[in-house]
Amino acid sequence: MKTNNDYVKTLTINELLNKDKYIIPIYQRNYAWGDDEISLLIQDLWNAKNKNNYYIGSLVIYKRGNGDLEVIDGQQRLTTLTLIMHYLKSETFVRNVSFEHRNDSDDALEDLDSDPIPDVFKNALKSIKKYWETDRTKEERMSLAEFLQENVKIIRTEVPEDTDLNHYFE
């Protein structure tokens, strides 16, 4: 039997994006973050860069029988972090987010360097590049990338396995 501590974990972004497989289910809205949300996230990272740790919010998941983690809340942030890691071309990064029953989005996320990709991903990558690089040296950008992976944390909460997901948000 799991205790409350087993359901709530604090993870670095590196741990979040390199350990488990996340599934974005069909009931989640499409990825929709635009320039405003992305610029705010990246500006928050630049502002927090000199802190020991920075908490970026939460992710709520349901663990499926096969071990995959179904994202209940936080998919916009998770997808944006995946896009940022792709942009950074981190050597340790392996894509671990999939879109269930959305082949166009899933295929695009699988190969973000291909063409064409959905405009929402293309625009997000442009925004990431713009706000990551604006008035920054290469050393500053590399330092922020390291900070993001090792010092930025997210609280991941797993709902109990007997949770009725149809009634979770009621």
Residue ranges and their predicted role:
Residues 1-170:
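Glycine- and hydrophobic-rich flexible loops that cap the catalytic core of alpha/beta enzyme folds
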